[in-house]
C-alpha cells in the first residue's frame, strides 16, 4: 500500500512469478504436471484494469509478453511467446531431470527419457501427437543450447 502512495506508482509494474527451487507440495513427484502449475501476477498502476488470463503458458513467455506491451522487439527471445497475441499457440512445456511434460487443449503427456516411455497420457487419445511435439521441442532446445 505504501508503494501506491508514491508518485511513480502510476507507471509501475510489479510481476510476481514462482520458481521451482523447492519441491512443493511435498507429496508431488518431480514429473507431475501440478508441480509446474504456477500463477503469474502483474500488479501496479501501469495495469489499467483487472483481468484474468487463463491460458497455458511457460515462464519463458514472460519476456515476449512484457516486451510486446512496452513496444520493444522480442525476436531474440527464441522460445518466448506473447500470451496476449491473438495467434498465441496455447501449450505448456516443462522438463524435469529425466524427461518432459507437454500440455495443450487436448490433454497432458509426460515422457520418461531414461525409461523411453510415457508416464502420463491423459487422455490417451492425442498423446502420440503431444509426445512428438514435446520431443521436437526438447530437441530444438538442446540444439539451441549446443549452438551457443
Please provide the spans of the model-predicted regions:
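Solvent-exposed soluble domains appended to multi-pass membrane proteins
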Residues: 1-148
